[in-house]
Amino acid sequence: MDIKRTVLWVIFFMSAVMLFDNWQRSHGRPSMFFPNVTQTNTASNATNGNGASGANAAAAANALPAAATGAAPATTAPAAQAQLVRFSTDVYNGEIDTRGGTLAKLTLTKAGDGKQPDLSVTLFDHTANHTYLARTGLLGGDFPNHNDVYAQVAGPTSLAADQNTLKLSFESPVKGGVKVVKTYTFTRGSYVIGVDTKIENVGAAPVTPSVYMELVRDNSSVETPMFSHTFLGPAVYTDQKHFQKITFGDIDKNKADYVTSADNGWIAMVQHYFASAWIPQSGAKRDIYVEKIDPTLYRVGVKQPVAAIAPGQSADVSARLFAGPEEERMLEGIAPGLELVKDYGWVTIIAKPLFWLLEKIHGFVGNWGWAIVLLTLLIKAVFFPLSAASYKSMARMKEITPRMQALRERFKSDPQKMNAALMELYKTEKVNPFGGCLPVVIQIPVFISLYWVLLASVEMRGAPWVLWIHDLSQRDPYFILPVLMAVSMFVQTKLNPTPPDPVQAKMMMFMPIAFSVMFFFFPAGLVLYYVVNNVLSIAQQYYITRTLGGAAAKKKAS
């Protein structure tokens, strides 16, 4: 029994270490096992034009504009004053800064249904404490960029009840013989914003500009449940390398690894539950850049060249900007691979089917809390044969525990003889001390995957269960579920054989207290899953142990 307990403790410890190491790498800290790999083409080479080719005028013209915070350059003296243009749709309230025609504030709104309250979260913002912007401009000459003040084209700024789309247009001043008209198109019920950049050559010579589209964000963390850390930072998706997360720490160390040139994919900023992404037209060649532009400010973007525009002619560059919740099915329909911003970590291959099943169950019951309960019940049913094998092994070990203790006492001065005697006992009684370990090992990845499913799913946000649980993404306000969790763990320890080692016995008694303290701050949906899982495990163990006990009694009576 001691050997089995030791193996289970090792498995538990290694699982915890792997989860911690995954969190370390997701937050820019060095891995305990894997060295950081430096990309062959660094971000600075891709964006700043430094190096062998950076000395020529073309590279200088294509350098990204400064003034990362959106302030006007010091050289622009009496310039037009920038204004904030407020707008609203059925899913957004926001502000567009006429300096650059930049999307400077965007609040996602979700109306309640009478049972649930209205929900809102601010994604883009530009305040003294937080910066998160979506902006565009031109490169390749002294052309309009995000530092220039645009003029708003007259038109409505709210989505009317009888309208399906809202268009907001902004016109730049003429610079370098070029004028830009930037148009945002908002569609009812959609988190995808159309962004059209019309480039007009009003000069006397041809121009060959490039359009840049970028997301600018500081590294301030978003609110997440205590002890539950999720990825925050830029991400790049291409057909070549698929989904590449980039930590702020890797950018700081110039170790960001990502594809720097493609004609497909998207770039994004990812945080818990929500993301933003620029999705250029497929087939259009673009350079990708990720860089640090201030001590706490970063940007990820694309530079897309435009064919030469003759005088009096114009060119249009269209792209889509996603800014919304990480709802998996919705993301799948927007762009290839966009659903990967919903980060399941290293258990994605198991977590995605689990979420699919959870979603199907929710479609039947209409409540995410009950869907969690039913999914846990289904998983326990699937693993019942494995659990039964584990509990049977534990029951058999419990039966011979007195004899094992007697052998340990008898041969305590001779460990070699003690081990030989224990092996002989196992052989005689046909008991495998590791027999209960394999079923547990097989189930661990599934339980960890379900943990990540419940932690990463924005569907839990604002979702009620019963009575006092009004939001499964928040902690239990009265700590009822964590207390039930502690009680269920305590009952489980009582059902298991008491370890012969007093220190180990005290540790097993202390575990329910330690875990319950941690679970006090976990989202209610996660704690609900663990409570249901523990209760079902207790029922399974009680049933199997009682069945085995009855069979043993009948055998003894006969």
UniProtKB/Swiss-Prot annotation:
UniProt record similarity statement: Belongs to the OXA1/ALB3/YidC family. Type 1 subfamily.
Record HAMAP family: YidC_type1 (MF_01810)
Membrane-spanning residues: 3-23, 364-384, 438-458, 477-497, 508-528
InterPro entries, per database record: Membr_insert_YidC, Membr_insert_YidC_N, YidC/ALB3/OXA1/COX18, YidC/Oxa/ALB_C, YidC_ALB_C, YidC_periplasmic_sf
GO CC, alphabetical: plasma membrane
GO molecular function, one term: membrane insertase activity
Sorted UniProt keywords: Cell inner membrane, Cell membrane, Chaperone, Membrane, Protein transport, Transmembrane, Transmembrane helix, Transport
Keyword Nuclease recorded: no
Cell location: Cell inner membrane
Protein role: Required for the insertion and/or proper folding and/or complex formation of integral membrane proteins into the membrane. Involved in integration of membrane proteins that insert both dependently and independently of the Sec translocase complex, as well as at least some lipoproteins. Aids folding of multispanning membrane proteins.
Top-level taxon of origin: Bacteria
UniProt keyword Protein transport present: yes
Oligomer status and interactors: Interacts with the Sec translocase complex via SecD. Specifically interacts with transmembrane segments of nascent integral membrane proteins during membrane integration.
One of the GO biological process terms: protein transport
Membrane topology of this protein: Multi-pass membrane protein
UniProt name for this protein: Membrane protein insertase YidC
